[in-house]
């Protein structure tokens, strides 16, 4: 009798765990912007990245990424780099720096707005932030390396 009780408990526990798996997977959805290898190195003097708060966007031909890259300078030594592909429709739409506010990037397709400090969604239909790349700055040479 005790053996039967243990078996029922084990089966109930297994069913409970299996019911939790789809919920847990839903939390970790894959980012819609495809992963592409990025290795881009440039001298910031040649672009509009002279001071904190400045931003520059590169085409995919210049920099790589899936749809190009936007670089934002946070401070004298800290930069952020994001793919220009919009998470709403990465195959057809790309974000651009807002000409009135270089802290923002906008997508004309879904009208989403993203903060270039960290790539988060400010407004719009986007469900994911911008895909971020690693930005490493060498102040001795004024070179910025963007990788993933």
Label the predicted regions.
Residues 102-104:
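Hydrophobic transmembrane alpha-helices and their immediate loop junctions
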Residues 110-111:
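Non-globular, low-complexity intrinsically disordered regions
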């Amino acid at each position: 009798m005790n053996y039967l009780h243990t078996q029922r408990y084990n089966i109930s526990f297994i069913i409970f765990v299996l019911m939790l798996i789809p919920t847990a997977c839903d939390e970790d959805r894959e980012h819609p912007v495809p992963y592409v290898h990025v290795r881009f190195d440039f001298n910031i003097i040649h672009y509009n990245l002279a001071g904190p708060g400045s931003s520059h966007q590169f085409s995919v031909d210049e920099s790589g990424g899936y749809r190009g890259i936007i670089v934002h300078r946070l401070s004298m030594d800290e930069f952020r780099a994001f793919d220009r592909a919009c998470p709403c429709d990465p195959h057809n739409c790309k974000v651009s720096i807002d000409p009135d506010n270089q802290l923002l990037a906008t997508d004309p397709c879904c009208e989403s707005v993203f903060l270039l400090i960290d790539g988060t969604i400010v407004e719009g239909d986007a469900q994911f932030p911008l895909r971020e790349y690693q930005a490493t700055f060498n102040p001795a040479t004024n070179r910025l390396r963007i990788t993933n």
